């Protein structure tokens, strides 16, 4: 059986920045270092950081006053920021800059008393943080996941309306909802460029290009990773068997019975070393040759948080 490796795959610039932020903070600050929420949605990465002394918490209420705390790549609400300030925490913000961009758009809508529609998955930490940017008493923010949700929605002022999206959604699915939004509310405003991040788009494009060449897909990523689940869905929608794994032990020999070509990709929060471990496991259960599938080369880099750059002396505080 041949293995085709999708390109690009794995860590994006926002995840790399978040993980590096935690590792560098461990070097420059005294333990313990607290992180609100999983810094990225990958069990292997989180477990590795726990072993290095990171304490993961659900809320800043669990962090002692004056302690060191890091916000995850998914971002937080204004209430969480205020709670952290009251506790006088030494705060490092690892929010992905592309999520921060979405936050700015929602805050601007709030400041203009515009109602806001957010396309995203209920309960996802990024969505919670984005919803929590809205403060207007005159307007409101609404969360929708589908065109069906949109059809049920009642807006007070369609002429003062803004939309935003979670960054890790399916590009195809979101385009349909956005078009439906524009059809229903012709005067709706939104970001100049769609909020779906470059890494999400690139990884989905890579899978689509590979689909006609494979008959089974393995996506390296955790079950709670939104973007990893979207990659898996692209294959299943085309009738191709697809599996989401974050541990080599999860690989099942039966997946590859009568299969000729296995595609392998990884969500934006899955490290390359884990991809290689899973490829090795696939090779153990069936004879394979591995080939890189040509794709987009990513060269995006996000600098570390300003406070951290100041502490380690690698950059000027702007």
Swiss-Prot record:
The gene is ispH. Keywords: 4Fe-4S, Iron, Iron-sulfur, Isoprene biosynthesis, Metal-binding, Oxidoreductase. Coiled coil: none annotated. Dimethylallyl diphosphate binds at residues 41, 74, 124, 225-227, 269. Disulfide bonds: none annotated. This is 4-hydroxy-3-methylbut-2-enyl diphosphate reductase. InterPro entries: LytB/IspH. GO terms for biological process: dimethylallyl diphosphate biosynthetic process; isopentenyl diphosphate biosynthetic process, methylerythritol 4-phosphate pathway; terpenoid biosynthetic process. Belongs to the IspH family. The keyword Iron-sulfur applies. Binds 1 [4Fe-4S] cluster per subunit. Its EC number is 1.17.7.4. It catalyses: isopentenyl diphosphate + 2 oxidized [2Fe-2S]-[ferredoxin] + H2O = (2E)-4-hydroxy-3-methylbut-2-enyl diphosphate + 2 reduced [2Fe-2S]-[ferredoxin] + 2 H(+); dimethylallyl diphosphate + 2 oxidized [2Fe-2S]-[ferredoxin] + H2O = (2E)-4-hydroxy-3-methylbut-2-enyl diphosphate + 2 reduced [2Fe-2S]-[ferredoxin] + 2 H(+). Pathway: Isoprenoid biosynthesis; dimethylallyl diphosphate biosynthesis; dimethylallyl diphosphate from (2E)-4-hydroxy-3-methylbutenyl diphosphate: step 1/1; Isoprenoid biosynthesis; isopentenyl diphosphate biosynthesis via DXP pathway; isopentenyl diphosphate from 1-deoxy-D-xylulose 5-phosphate: step 6/6. The active site is at residue 126. GO terms for molecular function: 4 iron, 4 sulfur cluster binding; 4-hydroxy-3-methylbut-2-enyl diphosphate reductase activity; metal ion binding. The lineage of its organism: Bacteria, Pseudomonadati, Pseudomonadota, Gammaproteobacteria, Thiotrichales. (2E)-4-hydroxy-3-methylbut-2-enyl diphosphate binds at residues 41, 74, 124, 167, 225-227, 269. Catalyzes the conversion of 1-hydroxy-2-methyl-2-(E)-butenyl 4-diphosphate (HMBPP) into a mixture of isopentenyl diphosphate (IPP) and dimethylallyl diphosphate (DMAPP). Acts in the terminal step of the DOXP/MEP pathway for isoprenoid precursor biosynthesis. Pfam families: LYTB. Isopentenyl diphosphate binds at residues 41, 74, 124, 225-227, 269. Its cofactor is [4Fe-4S] cluster. [4Fe-4S] cluster binds at residues 12, 96, 197.
């Amino acid at each position: 059986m041949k293995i085709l490796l999708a390109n690009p795959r794995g860590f994006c610039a926002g995840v790399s920045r978040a993980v590096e932020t935690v590792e560098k903070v461990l070097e420059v600050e005294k333990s313990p270092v607290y992180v609100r929420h999983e810094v990225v949605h990958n069990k292997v990465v989180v477990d590795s950081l726990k072993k290095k002394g990171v304490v993961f918490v659900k809320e800043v209420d669990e962090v002692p006053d004056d302690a060191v705390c890091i916000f995850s790549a998914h971002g937080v609400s204004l209430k969480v920021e205020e709670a952290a300030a009251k506790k006088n925490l030494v705060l490092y913000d690892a929010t992905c800059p592309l999520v921060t961009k979405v936050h700015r758009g929602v805050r601007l809508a709030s400041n203009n008393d515009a109602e806001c529609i957010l396309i995203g998955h209920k309960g996802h930490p990024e969505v919670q943080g984005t919803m929590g940017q809205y403060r207007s008493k005159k307007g409101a923010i609404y969360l929708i996941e589908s065109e069906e949700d949109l059809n049920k929605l009642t807006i007070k002022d369609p002429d003062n309306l803004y939309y935003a999206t979670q960054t890790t959604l399916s590009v195809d699915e979101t385009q349909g909802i956005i078009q439906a939004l524009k059809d229903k509310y012709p005067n709706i405003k939104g970001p100049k460029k769609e909020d779906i991040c470059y890494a999400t788009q690139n990884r989905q494009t890579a899978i689509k290009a590979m689909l006609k060449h494979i008959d089974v897909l393995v996506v390296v990523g955790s079950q709670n990773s939104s973007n990893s689940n979207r990659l898996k869905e692209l294959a299943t929608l085309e009738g191709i068997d697809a599996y989401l794994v974050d541990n080599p032990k999860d690989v099942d020999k039966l997946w590859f019975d009568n299969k000729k070509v296995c595609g392998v990709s990884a969500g934006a929060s899955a490290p390359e070393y884990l991809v290689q471990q899973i490829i090795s496991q696939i090779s153990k259960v069936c004879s394979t040759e591995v080939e890189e599938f040509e794709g987009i080369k990513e060269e995006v880099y996000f600098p570390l948080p300003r406070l951290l750059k100041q502490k380690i002396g690698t950059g000027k505080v702007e």
